[in-house]
UniProtKB/Swiss-Prot annotation:
The lineage of its organism: Eukaryota, Metazoa, Ecdysozoa, Nematoda, Chromadorea. This is Chondroitin proteoglycan 7. Keywords: Glycoprotein, Proteoglycan, Signal. Residues 32-41, 48-58 have a biased composition (Low complexity). The keyword Signal applies. It comes from the Eukaryota. Residues 1-19 form the signal peptide. Glycans are attached at S68, S72, S76, S84, S88. Residues 29-102 are annotated as: Disordered.
Length: 116
């Protein structure tokens, strides 16, 4: 009887702890890439969209990153970073990496807009 009680107490404590481990579940990231066109996506996981010419829109509860060569984009969610060919963006967490490993530097959105 005591063994059953102890196992029941352990189960009551362990189940809520393991239910909070989201990183153990399969991730549902969405990655979309195209040469020309537009795309739209929404969900609760990170969304990354890239296009050469066109526009895109994403919305969700997690972070959204959007970049385009010539076009426009809109995003809404908890964390949104938007940039276009003209160099506009509204985020202070942008990271830009170059091809040469010696010149890798993290830029804010304002520094990125000036450098473009």
């Amino acid at each position: 009887m005591q063994t059953i009680t102890i196992l029941a107490l352990i189960a009551c404590v362990a189940v809520p702890i393991f239910a909070d481990f989201d990183h153990l579940r399969a991730r549902r990231d969405v990655v979309e890439s195209s040469g020309e066109g537009s795309g739209e996506s929404s969900g609760e996981k990170p969304v990354v969209e890239s296009s050469g010419e066109g526009s895109g829109e994403s919305s969700g509860d997690k972070e959204a990153v959007e970049a385009s060569g010539e076009g426009s984009g809109e995003g809404s969610g908890d964390a949104t970073l938007e940039s276009s060919g003209e160099g506009s963006g509204e985020s202070h967490n942008a990271v830009v990496a170059s091809d040469s490993p010696k010149d890798v530097k993290a830029l804010t959105a304002n520094e990125f807009a000036v450098s473009v």
